[in-house]
Every structure is written in structure tokens, then in C-alpha cells.
């Protein structure tokens, strides 16, 4: 039906139907009047398909029933329906929006499953992050706190409070600072080997400590933080510890923040700094980063450009100093002599270049010798940002070029040639006062430090640019894709998002943003405090105001389809054609089947599906149902939250909701008769109907009548006689009395022969073995064995023993052969009754001289044993060839083969496991314990030299994994005492996300060792000396006392003579200074002359006001220029003053 008015007054039905039928469309006829009916019937067919489906609580009618609704608030409904008609009319601005190409974004909710978060009650400003991959931990410095977190999920390993003392805070506030400023903000955090060096503002009293990397609560050393950490937490600073252990810090070193310096301390070299109060060296700098590279220490900063003649502008700089610099002599004492700085150029090329002057962050990529920098426009100008990359070779080229020098304050800055164009921190070869000085002239070092040429980036255009956004932090990762190596940039913004971009020379991918990560909840905007990258774990660590986040660098598993995986253009991810999933190159099953498509920048999908807005308020309406009428409630909604955009789908679901309409119940048609309850014999059938056509609701009448009918069935179908098995008969007699026989029994099928199953059943019986019965064979006739020349002979006869169980006659076995031998004399006097055959043989042997009886040859060698173990046999044979029987001679008598037992030892046994024992009780009641069970290799045990059992002899299983009260596991046992006399124990948090009420406190504890556990090392002779104690008597004691008295007397005399000698020297030195009045402290009046003056000491000041190195007790200058005027007022004399009061005195009493 076209969208318009229908002249027919017939009402339509609310009927669900297939998409291609007219019944699918929800059409409402309004019977308030002809014009009203036509109006609504013209509007409703034009609803979106989702609004024409009868779903949910909407009233559904079928059949010829007609429905008519009266809406007092019809204008409200028509307005909602008409607004849904405007979805298809897209304004021109929306068409332009659909044509834009924007980079993809990852919403906070979509990123949360991949992110690990750490917060701590009361901790703020998580600005300092230091990675310790060897300890698998992240060191975090926050306001008043230090933390050790796990690199895997930033879970808490240790929390240590490092707050300022109450006196320090009160002193800070008395100087006009706020309570927020008068806290301890960590501003230096460096992991150096097994120590962590950290500095904090300490309520405007900077302090530094060195702590154990595995136990932050243990302080190894405390030193002054001045010139190493700023006073004010808002001042930028940076620091690096060189490979020689020297600290290079760039910060302001005074309370007011007007004395910036690049300062070296804590090493073997002398402390050095930049020139004090010299704006040409440093002009209101903001320090960004510091790196130890080769022979130099590099510092990246931004400052007011002193060489800019017109107005005030900010330039980005790179400065460097030689690590072997020892300062000057007489000129530039305690000051860098190798300090140089050059401008960093990051701009858009053109006839009038557009400069990004302010450096915000830097990242050193040592594998490529690259320095990436984040640059922005001035804070008061239009926001714009860029990322530029610089080669170290380009930086060195700028420092090897000419300098820029200003002769006087009114002169221009002009280029001047570099006296040492390839300066590499060389030193002077001469000895003496200039020993260890660099080869650079001190006069040049004092006036030539600004380079004339700027450091140019790798590419003329910035790697990445972005308007209307200010970048704040940057880290870079190297990713090996299938075809090339990519530099992936992670850029932090001041709004709290992280941009993931590509740095590549390809024009199609230049300035390509892969995605933007929203790490903060919607509506929250704050700059990132810190950004660190761990390449080995492919993870980002983000420092925020209230916590730390761990964000993975890749989320390949988030792309479910091949199109999404390849369309992301992510160098980390590719489609594995074999496994049919998105994975990294390392996780792919076959590199040849792993594909990527990084040919263009990814584009955000701006298509948006429509969504319904809120329902309008319920309005009463009436309906007509035949001769009766009732009331309903109706409401409507529009597809405008949001509207479909850029080809998105329309809203799915109904646009009109009709509910609470009163209905009288009506019966449905009777169902078909069910099957008869029996297959034979009398049964019954059932049919039903329900009061649901329609069901009564909202006050409607219920149906009148029965909902169930029954009737008899199968009255004339008798059941057949049942066929069944009779009982089993008795078991028959066993077929064998022993050795295992069989028994059977039978049953019969009653009323037929078609019973299911077998009619015969068998079972075994008499399984015990039968007794063995032996039988001997009769003796054989006597047979001659040896016949002598005289006619005497030996004869033998044989018989055999047979044995077999009666139940198995086929198992007959032959026993050992028994042999009897007798000797028969030649005269026949013996009782040798021979057989006729034997006599014939004997007579024939005596009558025929040519008859030769057989003789045995020698035995052959023994054969190999038939078995390797458990009693086998071996055999040897002989032949009747010595001689062979001839002319009717007798054959050889005896056996041609002889058997012998061999290898009676038992066979080797391979070991086998015994059964597992029962599980032991759980080792802990909470916090995670374990069961244990064991088995042994004794079933059987292996014989010596044979294979042992393979596998584990002990198994363990987890138990009692529920968390202990308050989330902590039980404390471990105290460890053994260390060399420092301390013990420690630890526990771990069982809660996945510990909150304020769970896992409070430290995860480790330490204590001094009890005296009973501290090992005491005694001399080797102590035992021997103990045996001689009984020989020490009173005589020995007296002799010892006298010896000690004499020794102390001699020592006292020596000390006294030494003091007298020193005092004489002191009197002589006093005469060097005449006793003239000290005009600075002249008291005047009538006091005695020797009481009118007080002692004073004058010293020359350090020219640069350097802070002495607290740890090495190193002072840069020898205090040679010291002048002293000394007077001794009565009643004291000159000997009452300690010699330390005067540096000129070098003799000290032995006191």
C-alpha cells in the first residue's frame, strides 16, 4: 500500500506474519471519525519495518475480530510517527560527515578487558615510573609514596610511605606555600643495578635517597637533594646516571626557581654546573629528557631563545657535555668547559615554514641511533602538535659546525668558525695545573656554546602532525612485520588519550594513525603524567593522577574476522590462514600462511544504526470488540536516539505499544483425540481446549464449559495370550571334577516360541587344578655299552617316567631318563642274562675278525643356552664315527646328545610403580594449600642395573584456595639471618582487585635477628684457652695490674711531651699576625685590650656557589686563601682554643 490515505473504513488487524505478506505490516484503523480513520491508516503503513512487528506486550489479534482505538492524545502519537519518517532525509552536513575519513578509536569500555589498573588510597601524582625487568617489577614514585608493582598486571608487591616530616611541612607553609605544595613529590627515580636512586621535593626541602631495589623500605643512603631535584613540584627536571655512576641532573637549584643548572655529582669526578645567572647559557629552560650516549651526556629542553631579536619566543634545544670534563682552572672553575647547545628544527616545510617550537617529550631508540621528539606550538597560540625524528649523526653534525656568538649585548648574533670542528672530548697531554683539562680553550668555552646551525630531522616533513591537539608524551616500539620493520609511535595527549601511529617513509602511510585509545572513563579529561614502554613484554605503563595502567601494545585477539584483522592495518597483527584467527607473527603456525595488508591507513567506520528514543507517557484509549467495548493504554516512541547515519540500519522493534486492553476469554477449537491409553483391551482417549482465543485479561470474562473430554476405546480388541519365559531349571552336573568344567541350565518359553532371549545359560565350575599322576614305563632290554678285548662288557637298560594332570591328558610331560649299568665278565660268571639278540651280536663279533663295532667320537662343543635366565639348557653332540660300525659290528651304545642345565639365575626385573597413597591433609586452611600423595617403585622393585620407574613419585593438588580473612595469605616463615643481621618474611594478596578494605599493609616484613640466632665466630684457639683458665691465679692478676700501671704511665708521659712541643709551635705561629685591632668586632669602652676583640675568620667564597658532594665529602676548591686574626681574652689563654679554629695550624694534640 503506498504511503497515503485509504478510503476504506475497514479496520485492520495486529497480526504477525512473514515478511512478504501484507499481514506483516502493523496497521491501525482509528474509528473516531472518517477523517481520523483515514489519517491514521494513511500514516501507519509507512512505519519502518521494525515498527510493524507485533512484539512484546503489544496486543495481537487473529481472525475476523476488528480492533478500534480511541486516543485522546492523538497528536502526540502522530508526532512520534512523523518524526520516524524524517530518518531518511539526511541533511547535507551529515552527508559531509559520512564522507570524512577518521582514524579508528577504541572506547574506554572496549579497552577495559585488556587493561590492568592500580590505585592506592591517599596516593596521587603517579608521575615517576622506572622499569626493572630483571626483578619483574615496576618502581613507581607518587606523592608521599613509593610502590613496587608486578610487570605482569601492576599488582602491588610493596608500598612504602615517604612523606615529609611535620616540621618540614610547617616550615614550608610558613614560607607562603600551600598545603598541596608542601608535600613530597618524587621527581627523580632511576634504577641502577640493585639500587634505586630517588629524589623528592620534600616540602621545598629537596632530599635524595638510595634504596634496595627489592625492598624500598630499606634506605641505604640519604643525601641532600639540592641541585638534583627541584624545590617546586611544578618545575620540570630530568636526570640520568651514567655508566660510571655519575648523576647528571638538569633542574633549578634554588627556592625561587631562578637558578637553572645542569649539574653533575655523586661520581668520582668533581661536581660541575652551567654558569650561574647567565641567561645565554640557560634562559628559563624547561628540561625534558637526558641520555648517556657515548662520550657525552645529552640534555633535551626548551627555553627562551636568547638569539631571537624580535620579541620573545621559545626554541627547542639539545645540549651536551663531555663526561670527562673536570672544569677550568682560574677561568670557569667548577663550570662545564664542554657545554654546547643547538636548536632542534621540527617544522612543516614551505615558502613560510610552520614551526613547532616547544619540545614536550623525547625518546631515544638506541637500536636505530634515533631521537624521537614531540613538539607543539606555543601554549597561547592555536593548538597543533608534531613528531619529528633526529639522527645522532645529524646532532653531531650540528655540534661540529660553526658557533653563533654575540660580541656585546647590543650586537647581533653572528656565525663564527668552530676552532675544533670534530671535538670528541679529547684532553691535554701536558701535566701540571692543566692536567686532565679538555683540549677546548677555556676562553672559547666561556663565549662559544650556541651552535649556528639547527639540527635537521630525518625527513623534511614531521612523521606525524595533528591540529587542535597537544601531544605530551611519546614512546616508540620496533615491530617486525612480514615485509618490513615498522616504528610504532605511542603518543600521549593532554586530554588523556593515547594515539597509536606509524612512522614510515611510505607516502601512503605517512602520518598514519592506527587507533586512538581512550584510557579514561567518558567525561574525564586529564593529561598523562608518565608513559613507559617495555618492549620484551609488549606493554605500555601509563602514569595518571590517581593510578597506574598497564595497556598491551597489541590486541590481535579482539579482531574476530579476517576483514577486521586485515582492515586494522596493525603491524603486530595478521591473519593466520591455517588457524583461522588473528594473531601475531610469533604466534602464527605457518609464516607463509600469515598475511598482512598494511597498504593504507585504517579508517573509522562512521556507519551508525538507529536507536529508539524513550517511550511517550501512557495514554488511555478504547477498543471495540464485536458488541462489547473496553479500555487500553497506548504509547509511542521515535527512532532518533540516535538516528540512522551513513547507511546504518533502521530501528528494530515496535514504535507503538498497546497494553492492558480488557478481553473476554474464548475457547480455542478442540484438539484431536489423543492415542488410546492401551494397545489392547479397554482404554480411554482425551481431547482438550484452552480459554486462550483470546485469553481473558484485564477484567475480561472467563470461558464457560469444559476444557477436557474423555471417551472409551479398544472395547472390542481383546489382548493376546501373553508369551513369557518359565523359571530356570537347576544347574547340571559339572563336566569336570577339576581343572575347570562347565554347568548349564535351561528354561522354556510358555504360550509360544518367540520369547526374547536365550533358553540356555552356562557357567564355569570346579576351577581348582587336578592332582598330578605319575607312571613309569617298563625297563628296556639290556644293551651292551662297552665290550673289552677279553669279552667283558657293560650293559644298560632304560625306563621313563610320565606325569600329567588327569583333566588334561594332552599336557603329558616326559620325566628324566633313568639309566642302569652292569658289568658282565667274559667268563660268564656274573648274573648277566642276555637276550638272544645280544648273544648273537656277541658271537658274531667274536667269529668275524672283520667286524668292527662303532665307537663314539669326541664330544662337540656346548651350544648356547636356550634361555638367558631362570634355568635353560644347553646341548652337545657326538657321532658314532670312531670307528663307524662295519661288517655287522655293534652300534655305539649311549646317547648321541647330552644336555646340561644353564643360566639358573633369576631374570632381571624392571621396576613398576606401586599404587598411589591416599591424599594427605591440606597444608593450609586458607590462602592456598596443597594435597600430596606418593608412590614407590616397588611393584616389583627393579633388579640391580635394570630400568627404574618412569614418572613422578609425588603428586600435589591445590586446596583451600579461598582467600584468608582480609585478603592476605598467611605469613611465610622467617628467613635465615643475613650478613646484615636481619630476617624477612612475606605474604601475598589473594584478592584479584584489592580495595581499600582488603590487603592493607605491606606484603613483606623484616626484623633484626634475635641474639640467639646471630652466628658468633670464635677464634680457633678459644677452646684451647678455655682449658687453661684454671691456671690463672692471684699472682697472675697482681702481675697484670702492675704491668698495666707502668704502661699507662709511660703513655701519659709521651702524650704530655707531644702536647708541649705543639704548644711551642703554636706560640711561634701567633707572632706572624701582629696584635692590631680588629675593626670589624672592636668593642671599645674601657674593657681590657685582650677582651675588646673576638676571633674571626675570613674565607674566599666559591665562585659558582656549588653544593658540596655529600656522599664523597668532596669540595671543589682547596681553601688556600684563609686569613685569621686571633686574640685570647682573659681568663682564657691561647692554649684553651682547639687548633681546628685556624686552618693554618696543622698540629693536633693527641687527645
UniProtKB/Swiss-Prot annotation:
<feature type="disulfide bond">
    <location>
        <begin position="749"/>
        <end position="755"/>
    </location>
</feature>
<feature type="domain" description="PSI">
    <location>
        <begin position="555"/>
        <end position="602"/>
    </location>
</feature>
<feature type="disulfide bond">
    <location>
        <begin position="937"/>
        <end position="949"/>
    </location>
</feature>
<dbReference type="Pfam" id="PF00090">
    <property type="entry name" value="TSP_1"/>
</dbReference>
<keyword id="KW-0735">Signal-anchor</keyword>
<feature type="domain" description="TSP type-1 1">
    <location>
        <begin position="664"/>
        <end position="720"/>
    </location>
</feature>
<feature type="domain" description="TSP type-1 4">
    <location>
        <begin position="910"/>
        <end position="965"/>
    </location>
</feature>
<keyword id="KW-0524">Neurogenesis</keyword>
<dbReference type="GO" id="GO:0030335">
    <property type="term" value="P:positive regulation of cell migration"/>
</dbReference>
<comment type="similarity">
    <text>Belongs to the semaphorin family.</text>
</comment>
<dbReference type="GO" id="GO:0030215">
    <property type="term" value="F:semaphorin receptor binding"/>
</dbReference>
<keyword id="KW-0221">Differentiation</keyword>
<keyword id="KW-1133">Transmembrane helix</keyword>
<feature type="disulfide bond">
    <location>
        <begin position="199"/>
        <end position="208"/>
    </location>
</feature>
<feature type="disulfide bond">
    <location>
        <begin position="922"/>
        <end position="959"/>
    </location>
</feature>
<feature type="disulfide bond">
    <location>
        <begin position="734"/>
        <end position="765"/>
    </location>
</feature>
<feature type="disulfide bond">
    <location>
        <begin position="738"/>
        <end position="770"/>
    </location>
</feature>
<dbReference type="InterPro" id="IPR036383">
    <property type="entry name" value="TSP1_rpt_sf"/>
</dbReference>
<feature type="domain" description="TSP type-1 5">
    <location>
        <begin position="966"/>
        <end position="1010"/>
    </location>
</feature>
<feature type="glycosylation site" description="N-linked (GlcNAc...) asparagine">
    <location>
        <position position="436"/>
    </location>
</feature>
<feature type="domain" description="TSP type-1 3">
    <location>
        <begin position="853"/>
        <end position="908"/>
    </location>
</feature>
<keyword id="KW-0217">Developmental protein</keyword>
<feature type="disulfide bond">
    <location>
        <begin position="676"/>
        <end position="713"/>
    </location>
</feature>
<feature type="topological domain" description="Extracellular">
    <location>
        <begin position="1"/>
        <end position="1036"/>
    </location>
</feature>
<feature type="glycosylation site" description="N-linked (GlcNAc...) asparagine">
    <location>
        <position position="236"/>
    </location>
</feature>
<feature type="glycosylation site" description="N-linked (GlcNAc...) asparagine">
    <location>
        <position position="153"/>
    </location>
</feature>
<dbReference type="GO" id="GO:0007411">
    <property type="term" value="P:axon guidance"/>
</dbReference>
<feature type="disulfide bond">
    <location>
        <begin position="680"/>
        <end position="719"/>
    </location>
</feature>
<feature type="topological domain" description="Cytoplasmic">
    <location>
        <begin position="1058"/>
        <end position="1151"/>
    </location>
</feature>
<feature type="disulfide bond">
    <location>
        <begin position="172"/>
        <end position="182"/>
    </location>
</feature>
<feature type="disulfide bond">
    <location>
        <begin position="865"/>
        <end position="902"/>
    </location>
</feature>
<dbReference type="Pfam" id="PF01437">
    <property type="entry name" value="PSI"/>
</dbReference>
<keyword id="KW-0812">Transmembrane</keyword>
<feature type="glycosylation site" description="N-linked (GlcNAc...) asparagine">
    <location>
        <position position="345"/>
    </location>
</feature>
<keyword id="KW-0472">Membrane</keyword>
<dbReference type="InterPro" id="IPR015943">
    <property type="entry name" value="WD40/YVTN_repeat-like_dom_sf"/>
</dbReference>
<dbReference type="Pfam" id="PF23260">
    <property type="entry name" value="TSP1_2"/>
</dbReference>
<dbReference type="GO" id="GO:0050908">
    <property type="term" value="P:detection of light stimulus involved in visual perception"/>
</dbReference>
<keyword id="KW-0325">Glycoprotein</keyword>
<comment type="function">
    <text>May act as a positive axonal guidance cue.</text>
</comment>
<dbReference type="GO" id="GO:0048675">
    <property type="term" value="P:axon extension"/>
</dbReference>
<dbReference type="InterPro" id="IPR036352">
    <property type="entry name" value="Semap_dom_sf"/>
</dbReference>
Amino acid at each position: 500500500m503506498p504511503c497515503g490515505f485509504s478510503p476504506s473504513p475497514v479496520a485492520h488487524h495486529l497480526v504477525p506474519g512473514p515478511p512478504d505478506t501484507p499481514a506483516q505490516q502493523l496497521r491501525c484503523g482509528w474509528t473516531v471519525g472518517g477523517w481520523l480513520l483515514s489519517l491514521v491508516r494513511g500514516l501507519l503503513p509507512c512505519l519502518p519495518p521494525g515498527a510493524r512487528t507485533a512484539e512484546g506486550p503489544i496486543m495481537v489479534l487473529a481472525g475476523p475480530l476488528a480492533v478500534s482505538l480511541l486516543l485522546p492524545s492523538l497528536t502526540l502519537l502522530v508526532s512520534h510517527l512523523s518524526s520516524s519518517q524524517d530518518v531518511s532525509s539526511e541533511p547535507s552536513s551529515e552527508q559531509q560527515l559520512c564522507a570524512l575519513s577518521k582514524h579508528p578509536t577504541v572506547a574506554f569500555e572496549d579497552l577495559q578487558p585488556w587493561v590492568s589498573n592500580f590505585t592506592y588510597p591517599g596516593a596521587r601524582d603517579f608521575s615517576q615510573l622506572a622499569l626493572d625487568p630483571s626483578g619483574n617489577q615496576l618502581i613507581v614514585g607518587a606523592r608521599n609514596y613509593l610502590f613496587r608493582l608486578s610487570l605482569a598486571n601492576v599488582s602491588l608487591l610493596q608500598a612504602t610511605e615517604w612523606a615529609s616530616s611535620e616540621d618540614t611541612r610547617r616550615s614550608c607553609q610558613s614560607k607562603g606555600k600551600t598545603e598541596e605544595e608542601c608535600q613530597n613529590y618524587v621527581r627523580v627515580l632511576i634504577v641502577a643495578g640493585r639500587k634505586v636512586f630517588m629524589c623528592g621535593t620534600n616540602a621545598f626541602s629537596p632530599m635524595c635517597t638510595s634504596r634496595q631495589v627489592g625492598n624500598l623500605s630499606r634506605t641505604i643512603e640519604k643525601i641532600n637533594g639540592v641541585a638534583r631535584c627541584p624545590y617546586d613540584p611544578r618545575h620540570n627536571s630530568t636526570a640520568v646516571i651514567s655508566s660510571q655512576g655519575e648523576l647528571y641532573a638538569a633542574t633549578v637549584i634554588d627556592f625561587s626557581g631562578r637558578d637553572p643548572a645542569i649539574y653533575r655529582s655523586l661520581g668520582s669526578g668533581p661536581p660541575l654546573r652551567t654558569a650561574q645567572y647567565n641567561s645565554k647559557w640557560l634562559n628559563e629552560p624547561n628540561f625534558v629528557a637526558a641520555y648517556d650516549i657515548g662520550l657525552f651526556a645529552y640534555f633535551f629542553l626548551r627555553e627562551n631563545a636568547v638569539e631571537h631579536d624580535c620579541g620573545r619566543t621559545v626554541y627547542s634545544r639539545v645540549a651536551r657535555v663531555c663526561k670527562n670534563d673536570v672544569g677550568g682552572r682560574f677561568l670557569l672553575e667548577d663550570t662545564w668547559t664542554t657545554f654546547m647547545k643547538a636548536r632542534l628544527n621540527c617544522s612543516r616545510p614551505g615558502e613560510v615554514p610552520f614551526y613547532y617550537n616547544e619540545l614536550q617529550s623525547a625518546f631515544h631508540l638506541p637500536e636505530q641511533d634515533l631521537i624521537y621528539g614531540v613538539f607543539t606550538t606555543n601554549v597561547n597560540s592555536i593548538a597543533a602538535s608534531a613528531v619529528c625524528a633526529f639522527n645522532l649523526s645529524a646532532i653531531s653534525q650540528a655540534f661540529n659546525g660553526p658557533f653563533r656568538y654575540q660580541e656585546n649585548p647590543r650586537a647581533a648574533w653572528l656565525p663564527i668558525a668552530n676552532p675544533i670542528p670534530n671535538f670528541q672530548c679529547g684532553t691535554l697531554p701536558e701535566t701540571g695545573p692543566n692536567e686532565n683539562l679538555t683540549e677546548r680553550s677555556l676562553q672559547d668555552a666561556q663565549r662559544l656554546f650556541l651552535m649556528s646551525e639547527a639540527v635537521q630531522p630525518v625527513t623534511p616533513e614531521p612523521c606525524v602532525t595533528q591540529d587542535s591537539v597537544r601531544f605530551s608524551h611519546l614512546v616508540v616500539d620496533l615491530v617486525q612485520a612480514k615485509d618490513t620493520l615498522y616504528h610504532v609511535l605511542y603518543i600521549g595527549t593532554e586530554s588523556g588519550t593515547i594515539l597509536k601511529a606509524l612512522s614510515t617513509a611510505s607516502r601512503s602511510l605517512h602520518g598514519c594513525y592506527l587507533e586512538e585509545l581512550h584510557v579514561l572513563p567518558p567525561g574525564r579529561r586529564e593529561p598523562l603524567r608518565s608513559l613507559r614502554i617495555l618492549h620484551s613484554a609488549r606493554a605500555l605503563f601509563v602514569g595518571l593522577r590517581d593510578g597506574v595502567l598497564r595497556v598491551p601494545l597489541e590486541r590481535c585477539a579482539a579482531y574476530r574476522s579476517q576483514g577486521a584483522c586485515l582492515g586494522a592495518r596493525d603491524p603486530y597483527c595478521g591473519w593466520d590462514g591455517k588457524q583461522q584467527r588473528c594473531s601475531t607473527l610469533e604466534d602464527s603456525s605457518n609464516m607463509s600462511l600469515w598475511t598482512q595488508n598494511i597498504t593504507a591507513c585504517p579508517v573509522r567506520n562512521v556507519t551508525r544504526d538507529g536507536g529508539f528514543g524513550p517511550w511517550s507517557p501512557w495514554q488511555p484509549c478504547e477498543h471495540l470488540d464485536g458488541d462489547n467495548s473496553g479500555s487500553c493504554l497506548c504509547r509511542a516512541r521515535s527512532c532518533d536516539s540516535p538516528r540512522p547515519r551513513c547507511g546504518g540500519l533502521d530501528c528494530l522493534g515496535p514504535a507503538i505499544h498497546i497494553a492492558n486492553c480488557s478481553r473476554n476469554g474464548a475457547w480455542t477449537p478442540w484438539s484431536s483425540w489423543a492415542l488410546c491409553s492401551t494397545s489392547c483391551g479397554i482404554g480411554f482417549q482425551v481431547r482438550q481446549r484452552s480459554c486462550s482465543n483470546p485469553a481473558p485479561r484485564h477484567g475480561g470474562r472467563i470461558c464457560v464449559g469444559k476444557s477436557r473430554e474423555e471417551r472409551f476405546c479398544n472395547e472390542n480388541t481383546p489382548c493376546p495370550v501373553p508369551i513369557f519365559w518359565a523359571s530356570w531349571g537347576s544347574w547340571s552336573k559339572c563336566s569336570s571334577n577339576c581343572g575347570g568344567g562347565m554347568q548349564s541350565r535351561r528354561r522354556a518359553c510358555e504360550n509360544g516360541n518367540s520369547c526374547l532371549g536365550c533358553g540356555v545359560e552356562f557357567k564355569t565350575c570346579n576351577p581348582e587344578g587336578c592332582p598330578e599322576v605319575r607312571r613309569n614305563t617298563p625297563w628296556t632290554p639290556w644293551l651292551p655299552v662297552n665290550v673289552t678285548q677279553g669279552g667283558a662288557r657293560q650293559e644298560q637298560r632304560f625306563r621313563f617316567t610320565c606325569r600329567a594332570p588327569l583333566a588334561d591328558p594332552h599336557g603329558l610331560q616326559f620325566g628324566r631318563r633313568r639309566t642302569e649299568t652292569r658289568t658282565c665278565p667274559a667268563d660268564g660268571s656274573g648274573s648277566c642274562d642276555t637276550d638272544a639278540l645280544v648273544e648273537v651280536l656277541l658271537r658274531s663279533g667274536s667269529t668275524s675278525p672283520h667286524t668292527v663295532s662303532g665307537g663314539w667320537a669326541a664330544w662337540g662343543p656346548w651350544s648356547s643356552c636356550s634361555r638367558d635366565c631362570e634355568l635353560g639348557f644347553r646341548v652337545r653332540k657326538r657321532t658314532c664315527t670312531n670307528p663307524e660300525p662295519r661288517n655287522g659290528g655293534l652300534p655305539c651304545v649311549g646317547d648321541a646328545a647330552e644336555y646340561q642345565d644353564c643360566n639358573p639365575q633369576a631374570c632381571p626385573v624392571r621396576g613398576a610403580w606401586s599404587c598411589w597413597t591416599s591424599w594427605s591433609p591440606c597444608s593450609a586452611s586458607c590462602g592456598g594449600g596443597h594435597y600430596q600423595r606418593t608412590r614407590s617403585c616397588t611393584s616389583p622393585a627393579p633388579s640391580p642395573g635394570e630400568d627404574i620407574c618412569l614418572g613422578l613419585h609425588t603428586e600435589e593438588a591445590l586446596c583451600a584456595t579461598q582467600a584468608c580473612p582480609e585478603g592476605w595469605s598467611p605469613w611465610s616463615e622467617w628467613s635465615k639471618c643475613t650478613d646484615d643481621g636481619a630476617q624477612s618474611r612475606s605474604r601475598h594478596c589473594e584478592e584479584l582487585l584489592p580495595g581499600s578494605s582488603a590487603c592493607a599493609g605491606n606484603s613483606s616484613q623484616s626484623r633484626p635477628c634475635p641474639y640467639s640466632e646471630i652466628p658468633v665466630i670464635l677464634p680457633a684457639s678459644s677452646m684451647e684457652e678455655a682449658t687453661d683458665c684454671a691456671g690463672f691465679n692471684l699472682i697472675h692478676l697482681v702481675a697484670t695490674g702492675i704491668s698495666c700501671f707502668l704502661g699507662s704511665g709511660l703513655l701519659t708521659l709521651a702524650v704530655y711531651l707531644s702536647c708541649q712541643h705543639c704548644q711551642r709551635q703554636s706560640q711561634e705561629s701567633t707572632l706572624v699576625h701582629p696584635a692590631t685591632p680588629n675593626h670589624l668586632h672592636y668593642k671599645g669602652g674601657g674593657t681590657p685590650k685582650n677582651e675588646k676583640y673576638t676571633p674571626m675568620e675570613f674565607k674566599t667564597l666559591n665562585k659558582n656557589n656549588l653544593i658540596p658532594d655529600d656522599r664523597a665529602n668532596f669540595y671543589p676548591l682547596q681553601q688556600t686563601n684563609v686569613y685569621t686574626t686571633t686574640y685570647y681574652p682573659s681568663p682564657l689563654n691561647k692554649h684553651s682554643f682547639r687548633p681546628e679554629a685556624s686552618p693554618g695550624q696543622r698540629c693536633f694534640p693527641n687527645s
